[in-house]
Amino acid sequence: MAAVERLTIATRASRLALWQAEHVRDLLRARYPACSVELLTLTTRGDQILDRTLSKVGGKGLFVKELETALLDGRADLAVHSLKDVPVDLHAPFELSCVLERADPRDAFVSNDYGSLADLPPGAAVGTSSLRRESQIRARYPHLVVKPLRGNLDTRLGKLDNGDYAAIVLAAAGLERLGLAARIRALLEPADSLPAAGQGALGIEILQGRADVRAMLAPLGDAATLACVTAERAVSRMLGGSCQVPLAAYARIDGDELALRALVAAPDGRRIVRAERRGPRDQAQAIGESAARDLLADGADAILAELLPTSPAP
């Protein structure tokens, strides 16, 4: 296979997205010094619509379409995504070629005045961008007011600093990647705020026909992270996972096994269905599918029927 002399990485324009793309660029440059690696910065529809929640405007696919168009028309060879933003069903001619080692998958509590969610007084406003976080906060702290929070990371922090919220809840990985870990007042353990499928991981998308790019990316992948996110995304896929569904799935490697936890919640947090499964890490897909079936059998089907036009059958 002929050596690739030039690679172009498609990325969103936010500071966090650029950090992620630059990280992949630096890894590729270090491994393939003879290859020129550059960035193509694009603005996605998801970046432009900031006055409505993702669940009301089309979901996660809004952050990838423009990058996929760049792959199709040859302007880019690969696209770097936060994996939690990548739809679980990538249709031809696209493929998720590589998953890098995961950063911290947890959610982070950020506030200028309070140390934790438990410290917030009744009626305090908490900002979050996802139904998943909202439902879990409402379940544990029904006295708090959860409000939508959109925009890039700097915009969200700015809204907190302007007094729009008493606290906000964000992905810890994004804060840490941008050197903002000092803003974190508390990390929310999975038992308290189960992460989204793929949270903290970076995924690289290419065209299925680009075997040359796939071969170059292979050494960048992390097998343990791939197993975990495969199980998590299997849960989401079977349940029609989208921004319209308060769905969480988090897997970790425990010795030779993969341990998975998943939940589906009603947006108001009054109903939460949970499932746990474990097994050999090479059975990640099956473990995720089994957990999804457990959720459906235990009542998630009723929640999904209220949220989705056509909900999955157990």
UniProtKB/Swiss-Prot annotation:
The protein's matches in Pfam families, at most eight in alphabetical order, are given as: Porphobil_deam, Porphobil_deamC
**Any one Gene Ontology BP term:** protoporphyrinogen IX biosynthetic process
Give a yes or no for keyword Translocase in this entry.
no
Work out whether the entry's keyword set contains Transferase: yes
| Record's keyword terms, sorted | Porphyrin biosynthesis, Transferase
Alphabetized CDD domains for the sequence: PBP2_EcHMBS_like
EC number(s) given by UniProt: 2.5.1.61
Enzyme kind, highest EC tier: transferase
Reactions catalysed, semicolon-separated, are: 4 porphobilinogen + H2O = hydroxymethylbilane + 4 NH4(+)
As to how many cofactors bind and how, the note says:
Binds 1 dipyrromethane group covalently.
Family membership, please give it.
Belongs to the HMBS family.
Q: How does it assemble?
A: Monomer.
- Name of the protein in its database record: Porphobilinogen deaminase
What lineage does the source organism belong to?
Bacteria, Pseudomonadati, Pseudomonadota, Betaproteobacteria, Burkholderiales
